[in-house]
Structures are given as structure tokens and as C-alpha cells.
Amino acid sequence: MSNLLFDEPGPRARRRIRIATVAGTVAVLALLALAVRQFAANGQLDAARWQPYATWPMWRYLLSGLWSTALAAVVSAALAMAAGLALALGRLSRRRWIRLPAAAYVEAVRTIPALLLVYVVLFALPRYGLDLPLFWKLVVPLAVSNAAAFAEIFRAGILSVERGQGEAGLAVGLTPGQTMRMIVLPQAARRVLPSIVSQSVGLLKDTSLGFVVSYAELLYSGKVLATYNGLLIQTYIVVALIYLVVNASLSKLARVLEARRPGVRPPRRRFARV
């Protein structure tokens, strides 16, 4: 199945991709081997330095940070998806006074880093009497930033539904709103579900900006823990592995959902002579 953004690579392009993948893998493995060698030379791999992470109190503290990360990510995602759906419908509206502001919001917010929005909520809003609780100082800017991305995902899903589906709803007497709610949106939601999960992975990583507002998410908890026990490298390696496991699991879920979409077949390995 061809991609909307680029053509499917031919035999030569696939061969170059395989060569680049192998070369990149070898380079990464070489860097990892060099890093392990340096860690070993400086005593960072000594068992005594890793022994604290075999105890429950350490993991209980890190898992508490992971729970705070997950909570912030879930609430941010829920708000961003609700706002994104409203923006997507606004961009598809026939009324200019709705369509233009929605389009302006999406185009503007997509160019603003989430960190800048965090600084706005942290420093600018309190000057005007709006000092949010610590949790919302992280959640609000993440929701505002990701709403634009979810809006484009939902809009693409709505536009991918065949025009005849909406026309059939209108033909049986449904109003445009009922047609969108009962016929178009359910189909669009199923089609964009893998993209929603992928965007949620990025949102989960963005919760690491919580260190700016001193919100006790996973990365901030790791920073506090490393300051307390002096095991800087070990702590951040463990935190990185936790992020790796969680994000890899979500990415796997996105691929599974993509493969189970109606009309989508898993890619087959093809061999061609060059």
C-alpha cells in the first residue's frame, strides 16, 4: 500500500535503506560498547553502585514518579483530544468565523515549543492573577500544545471517510450534525487510533518538562534521587530504561492497532533482483 507522503521505495532504494540501517546499527553498538568500556574503567559498573536499585524503596520512589507521569499524560491527552476534536470540526466548518480561528490556532500553536508554553503558565500567568496548582502548570501547556496535533489527526481521519458515507446519512433524513456524530466520526476514530496512540507517546515524553515546574514526575524524581544517593549515572540509566519500556510498549500497541485496521495487511518481505 502506497504512503500518502512518499512513494514506496524500489529495489535499489530498499537496498540502500538496508545498508544504511546496518551501518547505523553498527555505529550505535560501537558507541554503546565505548560507553560501557568507559563506565567500567571509572568503576560505574561496580555491583555496589547498582545494589541500591535491587531494593524496593528505590523502586517504590521511582514508580511513584512514573505514576505521576502517567497521570499527567492521561489528563493532558484527554483534554488535548477533546480540544483537538473541536478544532478539527471547526476547521471543517463552512462558517468562516469558526473555520479561520480554528485554523489560526492550529497553525500558530504547532510552531510554538511546549517548553515555551510551560514558561508562559509558570511565569506570565501569575503576574495577571492566574496562579495554577502545580499539576495544572504542566498539564495545561501540554494540552494546549498537543491539541493542535490531535486536531490535524482527527481532521485527516474525517477527510479519509468516503464522501458517500455522509451523503447516505443525509439521504435517510439525518441532520449534518447527526451524520457527523453517528456515521463519520466513529469510522474516523477507528482509522486514526494508531496515530492517536503514537501522538500519546510523544505527549508522555513531554511530561519530562515537569522538572521545570518541580512536578514530581519520573525524570524529576530521578533527579532528586540522584542528588540524594550520589548515583547520577545509575539513576538516569534506570530512568531511561523505564521510559524505554513504557514508550516501546505504547509504540508496539500503535503498530498492532495499525495492522488490525480494516483493509490493512501486514507488510510482506519481498525480494527483487537489482
Regions found by a protein language model. Name each.
Residues 1-274:
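Transmembrane alpha-helices and adjacent helix-loop boundaries
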